[in-house]
From Swiss-Prot:
Belongs to the HSP33 family. It is found in: Cytoplasm. Disulfide bonds join C231-C233, C264-C267. This is 33 kDa chaperonin. It holds the Pfam family HSP33. One of its GO terms (cellular component) is cytoplasm. Its main location: cytoplasm. CDD domains: Hsp33. Under oxidizing conditions two disulfide bonds are formed involving the reactive cysteines. Under reducing conditions zinc is bound to the reactive cysteines and the protein is inactive.
Amino acid sequence: MSNQDLLYRYLFEEYEVRGELVQLDHTYRHVVEAQSYPVQVQKLLGELLVATSLLTATLKFEGSITVQLQGDGPVRLAVINGDNNQQLRGVARYEGELPSDGKLQSLIGNGQLIITITPEQGERYQGIIALDADTLAGCLEHYFAQSEQLATKLWIRTGYHQGEPRAAGILLQALPAQSEDHSADFDHLTQLTATIKDEELFGLEAEEILYRLYHQDKVRVFDPQAVEFRCTCSRARCEGALLQIEKEEVLDMVQELGKIDMHCDYCGAQYQFDGIDVETLFSRAPDNDANKLH
């Protein structure tokens, strides 16, 4: 597969149904390799990556979506953030022994799925969904049924292709209600899409996948959108965080530890500050008092 980390939107010309297809390679590897996650957590993050990419593709405005799983199980938190530019990042928190079955409820325990939509202009929206389905895809289908009241079906897969981790998924969604009932059309397309195999999703070009699934239907495929891992951490952000603390307290930490190490959980980057760095940072701050929390 030559073109990786792409999201395709497509439309059925004879049906009131739209679709999305995403395939992730480098983005998935960036997320799971940052923390050397166990296989079960890698799989969960891969599913969340696919879900977040498909969800952000539904945005009709500039903004971001955060898809978060949290509960009392071994995986306390798993979260992916993505924006309308298909820039994704994510992290997970886990402790103790992980169940070998890797099932959603086994990993999260008693928990919930939280979807937060944050437009650049306008109010933030948050939906909280019970983990009342066996899979993340099933939980998201319930979310769409409750929030948008549109028939939606998702296929989310993670695995390996030629020894490398891959994640991919498909979303089918009925268009807003028209005067006629198109449920039979949606069911027809759902049955076709359900024949997709993991090796096809991971190894074939998107155009070939869509042809294999829907070659008897007229499908309009739009230009793909690149998907990428993007972390917003920087040394400047770390400096801003340090400036929120009293200078003497920061210097005490340096004296005790030798230096301050700040670690980004999203990308694994390390930022170090020694005594000279701290003195320089506070000396060039325009107004030290204005940068402190009281």
